[in-house]
Curated annotation (Swiss-Prot):
GO biological process: chemical synaptic transmission; modulation of chemical synaptic transmission; negative regulation of neurotransmitter secretion; neuron cell-cell adhesion; postsynaptic membrane assembly; presynaptic membrane assembly; synaptic vesicle endocytosis
Subunit structure comment from the entry: Interacts (via extracellular domain) with isoform b of madd-4; the interaction is required for the localization to postsynaptic domains. Interacts with unc-49.
Entry's Gene Ontology cellular component terms: axon; cell surface; dendrite; plasma membrane; presynapse; synapse
Keyword Cell membrane: yes
Protein name: Neuroligin-1
Physiological role: Probable neuronal cell surface protein thought to be involved in cell-cell-interactions by forming intercellular junctions through binding to beta-neurexins. Plays a role in the clustering of the GABA(A) receptor unc-49 at postsynaptic sites in neuromuscular junctions (NMJs) via the interaction with madd-4 and neurexin nrx-1 and is thereby required for normal GABAergic synaptic transmission.
Family: Belongs to the type-B carboxylesterase/lipase family.
Protein species of origin: Caenorhabditis elegans
Keyword annotations of the record: Cell adhesion, Cell membrane, Disulfide bond, Glycoprotein, Membrane, Signal, Synapse, Transmembrane, Transmembrane helix
Cystine crosslinks: C86-C125, C288-C307
Length: 798
């Protein structure tokens, strides 16, 4: 027994020297471990799990902005276990019977696989995981680019711990970082006072993590100047918001590139439309505000927040479940606060104000059916009736629009009806509903994001690429071969980017499983393109596609152009037969981005009509809707006018001129963008211009009047001065004696001022009659009169 123990002691240091890796950073030393990725003889990867980047947001720090983590220089940090996940406030239904009434079988299966990763929850959850491929040596010349993953699905649940970055790091030869950030009410408790809003603490977590990474990445062999931020679903929305956030540019940008998968801040669900309503409802449920309030706004916001900070996380989570959020919208989500989110995304992404947004390299990926998880499993199998389609579309119109609802509803039904199949088969109707929800909630906003980023009005150095992921994972599909649903489903892109199909065998414990040989080839293609983009901002560079695997030969010969007007909005369709196509779902995108906004805009600008004109038929019948509807109110989509945009960097620092294009290529600003920007600035700008012009006219008139009075006074002064000079020269008065208009008028001759006898008449030149008579008499006498001979006042008066 002693020999065995001695042998273990002998070999243990050798094993640990291979398994353990220590890295010294400015925050302190961290100890991770080396693991071998599954499949294809990939190099080992050192993983450092559970590295803190923020102070535990509890007590007085709850609901507030993130604070950087304290340093641990006194002792090494053990980084071999993942941290607890953040509090999950809006978990999906886990009962199969109930879940299948609201979601697909594929999403239900994924939720169950994710559940084990969500069991250990805590508010102390601001941690990240770093995956570094092993190399022989590290120097400044071979620092690795970095990809930071922002997990998605929804704002209320999820974790970065569940996604293993070892395969992607080893295959792509990049550093992969996953992290946790506050979710739901803990990360997005929006509240508004009389003139400002706050509540984007979850986004501040991401900024805090990026700030720390920019400092410590060189210690891990990472390039802090080559960071890519990637996200899907709600995570993609957060990434796009950070692209336009001034807080990501303290000195230089905290990240250089971005990847958006099935999500954008332009989606209707991306921004909370009425945060104060949810804030006050939560305050009532927690007894932090009276229930008999008459207004959604309260001057004691700080007092209410302090009351909420005292409650336990369990109480808050239970209270959130009692708050109804309209279907297709988000309750506790990012808000426009003027700091992290300076303005509405439609404005921040525009060509006029989007200089920060447009200087980031962008790669966008869209699945074939991004709203697949929003259709119930039964409806996906057998189809949807016309009556249910009407309820779904009525809820969509009521929750997303305020004006001309009947006209918008009729337009949507007309657009997504298969007129070539007049029988209205339930599966045909299902396909129309699936396409409509995918287009309005995902596809159209993403295309609008791409167009704003690639607009040619002010050409920039950043690249813009798009791919449509159409590969089908056949083993996941529960549909029959003739179901009519083709292509990828919501969430399908993620496992292919992380390299899950390369794992050997299937396991129920894995987050994803059930892949075949074709799936493995597509996964290699996706990891190659993504790692290339992380390195250079171009999916095709710097490394060409390898031909050493079945799919590689096909993709090697396929060029991938940029998404812009000169290339006719080109994108790469990723299937086993890749093709470059143009104008992705252009007719449907035009319907949602141009026609519907114009129809809705006319309702705002036309003559006032009765409010009932904009209501749907049977507007208040609850059974005529699907899910939860927005309450009847006239509130605007933003509680207050957003603050003005911060100053943009000088154009010459962020953009470069481009040779002139034809007028058709320069026309990239869509009507929806103009409507969004116009609706925001039109009335306010018009009022400012009107008032400014009024003040300008008043000032000009006042200036003219003052100028005229001053000129008149000057002319009189000159006239008086001339008359005084003539008078003094004729009567012996020196100019030095009477050269001031402020002196008393001279009535007596200065030479006789001490005489008591009758003096010569001193005629004031200001006398219109006597002054002229005196001058005429003087001229007739040849100017030879002495003082004694001068005419008396009586002589002149006769």
């Amino acid at each position: 027994m002693e020999r065995i123990y001695l042998l273990l002691l002998l070999f243990l240091p050798r094993i640990r020297s291979y398994d353990v890796r220590s890295v010294t950073t400015s925050w302190g030393m961290v100890r991770g471990e080396v693991v071998s990725p599954e499949g294809d003889d990939l190099p080992p990867v050192a993983q450092y799990l559970g590295i803190p980047y923020g102070v535990a947001p509890t007590g007085q720090y709850r609901f507030n902005m993130a604070i950087s983590a304290a340093k641990w220089t006194h002792m090494p940090k053990d980084a071999r276990k993942v941290s607890p996940v953040c509090i999950q406030t809006d978990m999906p239904e886990l009962s199969e019977t109930k879940a299948f009434k609201h979601t697909s079988a594929q999403r239900f299966d994924f939720n169950h696989r994710l559940l084990p990763h969500l069991k250990k929850q805590s508010e102390d959850c601001l941690y990240m995981n770093i995956y570094v491929p092993e190399r022989l040596e590290i120097s400044r010349d071979n620092y690795l680019p970095v990809m930071v993953i922002v997990h998605g699905e929804e704002y209320g649940w999820g974790t970065g711990n569940a996604f293993n970055g070892t395969t992607l790091a080893a295959y792509g030869h990049i550093i992969v970082v996953t992290l946790n950030y506050r979710l739901g009410v803990f990360g997005f408790l929006g509240r508004c006072e009389s003139s400002s809003c706050s509540g984007n603490s979850g986004i501040s977590d991401l900024v805090s993590a990026l700030t720390m990474l920019n400092v410590i990445l060189p210690s891990f062999g990472g390039d802090s100047k080559s960071v890519t931020l990637a996200g899907w679903g709600s995570g993609a929305s957060l990434v796009s918001l950070l692209m336009a956030s001034p807080l990501t540019q303290p000195g230089r940008r905290l990240f250089r590139r971005a990847i958006l998968l099935d999500g954008s801040a332009l989606s209707p669900w991306a921004i909370s439309q009425n945060p104060q309503q949810y804030f006050m409802q939560l305050a009532e449920e927690l007894a932090c505000a009276p229930k008999n309030r008459t207004s959604s706004f309260n001057d004691n916001v700080d007092t209410i927040v302090r009351c909420m900070q005292v409650h336990s996380s369990e109480n808050i989570t239970k209270a959130v479940l009692k708050i109804d959020v309209p279907t297709f919208l988000s309750g506790f989500a990012p808000i426009v606060d003027g700091q992290l989110i300076p303005n509405k995304p439609q404005v921040s992404f525009s060509t006029q104000y989007g200089s920060l947004f447009r200087e980031i390299d962008l790669l966008v990926g869209i699945s074939s059916n991004p709203s697949h998880h929003m259709i119930s499993n039964e409806d996906l199998k057998v189809g949807i009736s016309k009556e249910k389609r009407m309820r779904i579309f009525r809820s969509l119109v009521r929750n997303l629009y305020d004006f001309h609802r009947e006209e918008i509803l009729a337009s949507i039904i007309n657009e997504y009806t298969d007129w070539e199949n007049p029988r209205d088969h339930p599966k045909s109707i299902r396909n129309g509903v699936l396409n409509a929800l995918s287009d309005v909630l995902y596809t159209a906003p993403l295309i609008e994001t791409l167009r704003s980023h690639s607009a040619d009005e002010v050409r920039k150095e950043a690249n813009t690429f798009m791919f449509a992921f159409a590969h089908e994972t056949r083993s996941w599909s529960q549909e029959q071969p003739n179901s009519g649903i083709r292509g990828s489903l919501s969430g399908d892109i993620v496992p292919y980017i992380f390299g899950y199909p390369l794992a050997q065998g299937d396991s129920e414990e894995r987050l994803y499983s059930g892949f075949n040989t074709d799936d493995k080839g597509i996964s290699k293609v996706m990891m190659h393109y993504v790692s290339n983009f992380v390195k250079s901002g171009d999916p095709s560079k710097p490394n060409p596609m390898s031909k050493n695997f079945p799919m590689g030969d096909v993709f090697h010969s396929t060029a991938w152009p940029q998404f812009d007007q000169p290339n006719r909005e080109a994108y790469l369709e990723i299937t086993d037969r890749p093709r470059v196509k143009n104008y992705y779902r252009n007719a449907q995108v035009g319907f949602w981005n141009n026609f519907i906004p114009q129809l809705h805009k006319n309702g705002k600008e036309t003559e006032p009509v009765g409010e009932e004109h904009h209501l749907l038929s049977d507007h208040f019948r609850k059974d005529s809707y699907f899910g939860k509807t927005r309450h009847f109110s006239s509130y605007a989509n933003l509680p207050f006018p957003p603050p003005p945009m911060p100053p943009s960097p000088p154009p010459e620092l962020t953009t470069k001129p481009k040779p002139s294009e034809s007028p058709t290529t320069l026309q990239t600003t869509t009507e929806s963008e103009k409507a969004a920007a116009g609706s925001f600035t039109g009335k306010a700008l018009g009022g400012v211009i009107f008032i400014g012009c009024g003040f300008l006219i008043m000032n000009v008139c006042l200036l003219i009047a003052v100028r005229r009075e001053w000129g008149k006074k000057r002319r009189n002064e000159k006239k008086f001065q001339l008359q005084y000079q003539t008078y003094n020269s004729n009567h012996g008065g020196g100019a030095e004696q009477y050269n001031s208009l402020n002196s008393p008028e001279p009535l007596l001759s200065a030479s006789h001022k001490n005489s008591t006898s009758m003096r010569p008449a001193g005629i004031s030149p200001t006398c219109p009659r006597h002054g002229r008579a005196a001058l005429a008499l003087q001229n007739s006498r040849g100017n030879s009169l002495t003082a004694a001979q001068a005419p008396t006042l009586e002589e002149i008066q006769v």
